[in-house]
Amino acid sequence: MQLFWHRRDLRTTDNRGLAAAAPGVTAVDGGHDQGPVAAVFCFDDEVLAHAAPPRVAFMLDALAALRERYRDLGSDLIVRHGDPAAVLPAVANDLDATRVVWNHDYSGLATDRDAGVRDALDAAGVAHAQFHDAVHHRPGEIRTNAGDPYSVYTYFWRKWQDREKNPPAPEPEPADLAADTALADTSPLPSVQELGFAEPEAAVPDAGTAAARSLLDAFRESGDIYRYEDRRDYPHEEPTSRLSPHLKFGTIGIRTVYEAARAAKSDADTDDERENVAAFIGQLAWREFYAQVLYFNQNVVSENFKAYEHPIEWRDDPAALQAWKDGETGYPIVDAGMRQLRAEAYMHNRVRMIVAAFLTKDLLVDWRAGYDWFREKLADHDTANDNGGWQWAASTGTDAQPYFRVFNPMTQGERYDPDADYITEFVPELRDVPADAIHSWHELSLSERRRHAPEYPDPIVDHSQRREDAIAMFERARGDE
């Protein structure tokens, strides 16, 4: 018998490690005869220490769906809680398993954990194998001609799109899996509270492969994929896939998403439609670019990627930070985004850029404070993606927004939410206010603002002044002053 250790790959289809372990599947590892596979998931306290209620709730829902799928296949999911370096050798011993298989993860925490598991399995005399599954191309596979990892996305993308991609891996057959009667006690799944977390305040999206597949199919069949590039920045329309939490937890495989996009591109009727699909595929490449940046620069989780001559003089402003978190800044598009985050454990991507730019360039607050808040509230928080996005907005990251380009939150709102539909969905105080007044809120007199929406706050900063302050702050950090 073998064990397959699930982590952020909570699915049975298009799972390269699971397919490689399955004796009857030859597409990934060429086939072997090392016995049927028993699936195991381990709640790791070190990983849970970095979790938050929305993601824990989503993960538990995904695990319930995964367990149900294994039961449909005549097997089950073994659930344990503890240090994987102790749990996996013990489960292997209980089941007389001779090999443990899992998929690579690329964060510093994951690579350290996996090294400890390998050492423990070696000491127990249990073989092990790992496979690349979460990305098409493992970190370091795509490099510059000089052999260095890319730090500029455009050049990475050019090579990424030309590389051959693996097809989706097949799901194991029931005969490939350990029968449920042969498994040790599988244990019930804990609740969010039993894992030490409060119930999430947000409405967490449905998890599981069926939910992910439904989203992907709807993205194609509705035609949204053919409008993706043209309309993705408009939060009220949002022709996006909403697959981000599913890719985070691996309830759908990256190859499945890529193949669906390729098929849509092949079926496109016009060059414009093909360009829209290509833009979506480009976002899949961004995900792998940031995974590579993190893999080779683990310090970016807490440090600027880009070195400045002097420290950036971020402001310690708890009141401004709290107003930003609460969606009470007096900048409507910013407040709508922050309130969507609380309500849905999600925020539209364009609005993520706007609120990140506002925190770092208008409030002059360190990007790490915003990153930490997103990590606490997002169901789709991914260390590499979120860190890359925050450092891009803060002009501290790889291939980042130039420091002198400062988003104007009012013009951003007017451009991407012209009728204020998104804003008024999440900021009810403004629902009876005309769109032109919402987009000129900062220019209205105090009496006009009180007449339109007495409960909505005044702008907490003057954008024009803070733009100058932000540029000066970065010029001092650069040593220009």
Curated annotation (Swiss-Prot):
Q: Where do the segments described as Interaction with DNA lie?
A: 283-290, 349-350
Report if keyword DNA repair is assigned. Answer: yes
* GO molecular-function term, one example from the UniProt record: FAD binding
Give the required cofactors: FAD; coenzyme F420-(gamma-Glu)n
Name of a matching Pfam family: FAD_binding_7
Query: Which keywords does this chain's UniProt record carry?
Result: Chromophore, DNA damage, DNA repair, DNA-binding, FAD, Flavoprotein, Lyase, Nucleotide-binding
- Residues that, per the record, bind FAD: Y228, T240, S241, R242, L243, S244, D380, H381, D382
Family classification: Belongs to the DNA photolyase class-1 family.
* Known partners and oligomeric status: Monomer.
Output this protein's name.
Deoxyribodipyrimidine photo-lyase
Q: Which organism is it from?
A: Halobacterium salinarum (strain ATCC 700922 / JCM 11081 / NRC-1) (Halobacterium halobium)
Q: Which gene encodes it?
A: phr
